[in-house]
Amino acid sequence: MKKFLVFFLAILALTFVACGKDKNLESYLDMEKIQSEFNIDEKDDEHIKFKDKDEPRSAYRIFNFQKMKSVDFKNPKKIDKLEEFYLGKNCDIIYKDESTIIILVLVQDNSYAYNIQSFDDSKTELMIAVSIGSDKELSETELFNLLDEAKSFIK
């Protein structure tokens, strides 16, 4: 159930993203680290999606990195649009600032589903999405640690 929920969350996370066309995305990411620790689900020049290897875990994670067009990345309302989208789906906003939004998407049968979306321009204009399925409620600190882990893949 957790894996299905997280897959669904990953699809939701990509709803508002448009691709850029400059450098290959792999040139910005630590692919060696990603390949050693995760299973890559999808990969092309503008997008990579990878998830936990099938090990028993209390939190199952799917990471998405997507290059964006500059005009979309610089849209000052992108986080507000995401917030509006998630609120329309009856989700709870846990945290929001100008570059990051953390959402509790679903609580069902002692399972929790979260989405974290963040925008990073330290190397290129990237959308980072982390979808998490957990058998326990995660604190805001734990969710930020997962975002930090996602950002650690950027070279």
Residue ranges and their predicted role:
Residues T15-A18:
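C-terminal motif of bacterial Sec signal peptides marking the signal peptidase cleavage site
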